[in-house]
């Protein structure tokens, strides 16, 4: 019985698709192994199932094979000569860039009031609108900068006021301490002056008192 040829298109039935994937995957892994053994070739195979499951085979080390592949492709790209088509494309891009630069330079000169002698009414109106728009942007930015500076000055004022208050409190407590010390010294001197410090003179009389003498 002749086996029918399989049509190369996506299998719609999910179960049949999974069965076919398992069979073909095993066959592919087997072929990769046989190729590496029979031909002494470095073979690496990476397969992701429809559900994202990884299947891999490497005759040596998978990462080493990947690194070798990246080095090979990098060298191949770096040594690839620039084709005529790429050269023409680069020339076109360079010419287009120069044209844009010239247009920007001309627009800049017109905004500065230079080279407007040949401008039409429409072009002059367009330049005027651009200038008005620029002035509005500048004024808005200027207002914003003023607000930021005012806010910074307010914050600085608050910081200076707080520092001044701390210094005032510190100076007030120091002044009170000085006055307290002065009062204590004054009180001490007053007590010394008011206390009896004079010496008492005594005389020794021998005999009868004067009133009893005859």
UniProtKB/Swiss-Prot annotation:
Q: Where in the cell is it found?
A: Nucleus; Cytoplasm
- Tissue expression as described in the entry: Widely expressed. Not found in the apical meristem of short-day grown plants in vegetative stage.
Specify the domain of life of the species encoding this protein. Answer: Eukaryota
Transcription found in the keyword field? yes
Compositionally biased spans, kind Basic and acidic residues: 162-177
The protein's matches in InterPro entries, at most eight in alphabetical order, are given as: MADS-box/MEF2_TF (IPR050142), MEF2-like_N (IPR033896), TF_Kbox (IPR002487), TF_MADSbox (IPR002100), TF_MADSbox_sf (IPR036879)
Q: What is the effect of changing residue 34 to K?
A: In sso11; partial suppression of early flowering time mediated by SOC1 overexpression
One GO biological process term is: cell differentiation
Q: Name one GO molecular function term.
A: DNA-binding transcription factor activity, RNA polymerase II-specific
GO CC annotation terms, alphabetical: cytoplasm; nucleus
Domain spans labelled K-box: 87-177
What is known about its induction? Up-regulated by gibberellins, vernalization and under long-day conditions. Gradual increase during vegetative growth. Induced by AGL24 at the shoot apex at the floral transitional stage. Repressed by SVP during the early stages of flower development. Inhibited by AP1 in emerging floral meristems. Repressed by SHL to prevent flowering.
Region listing for Disordered, in residue ranges: 162-214
Keywords (A to Z) from UniProt: Activator, Cytoplasm, Developmental protein, Differentiation, DNA-binding, Flowering, Nucleus, Transcription, Transcription regulation
In which residue ranges is the amino acid composition biased (Polar residues)? 178-187
Principal subcellular localization: nucleus
Residues forming the MADS-box domain are: 3-57
By its UniProt entry, which SUPFAM superfamilies does this protein fall under?
SRF-like
Q: What happens when the gene is disrupted?
A: Plants are late-flowering.
- Outline the subunit composition: Forms a heterodimer with AGL24 through MADS-box domain. Interacts with AGL15, AGL16 and AGL19. Interacts with OXS3 in the nucleus.
Summarizing the function annotation, the protein's role is: Transcription activator active in flowering time control. May integrate signals from the photoperiod, vernalization and autonomous floral induction pathways. Can modulate class B and C homeotic genes expression. When associated with AGL24, mediates effect of gibberellins on flowering under short-day conditions, and regulates the expression of LEAFY (LFY), which links floral induction and floral development.
Q: What is this protein called?
A: MADS-box protein SOC1
The species this protein belongs to is Arabidopsis thaliana
Q: What is the lineage of its organism?
A: Eukaryota, Viridiplantae, Streptophyta, Embryophyta, Tracheophyta
């Amino acid at each position: 019985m002749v086996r029918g040829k399989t049509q190369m298109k996506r299998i719609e039935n999910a179960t049949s698709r999974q069965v076919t994937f398992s069979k073909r995957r095993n066959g592919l892994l087997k072929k990769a192994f046989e190729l590496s053994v029979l031909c002494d070739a470095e073979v690496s195979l990476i397969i992701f199932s429809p559900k994202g499951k990884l299947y891999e085979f490497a005759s040596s080390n998978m990462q080493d094979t990947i690194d070798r592949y990246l080095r090979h492709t990098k060298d191949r790209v770096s040594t690839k000569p620039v084709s005529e088509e790429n050269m023409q494309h680069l020339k076109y891009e360079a010419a287009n860039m120069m044209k844009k630069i010239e247009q920007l330079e001309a627009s800049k000169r017109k905004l500065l009031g230079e080279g407007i002698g040949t401008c039409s009414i429409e072009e002059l109106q367009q330049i005027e609108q651009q200038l008005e728009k620029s002035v509005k942007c500048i004024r808005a930015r200027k207002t914003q900068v003023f607000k930021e500076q005012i806010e910074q000055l307010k914050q600085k004022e608050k910081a200076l006021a707080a520092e001044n208050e701390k210094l005032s409190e510190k100076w007030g407590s120091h002044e009170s301490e000085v006055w307290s010390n002065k009062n204590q010294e004054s009180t001490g001197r007053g007590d010394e002056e008011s206390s009896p410090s004079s010496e008492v003179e005594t005389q020794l009389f021998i005999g009868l008192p004067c009133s009893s003498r005859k």
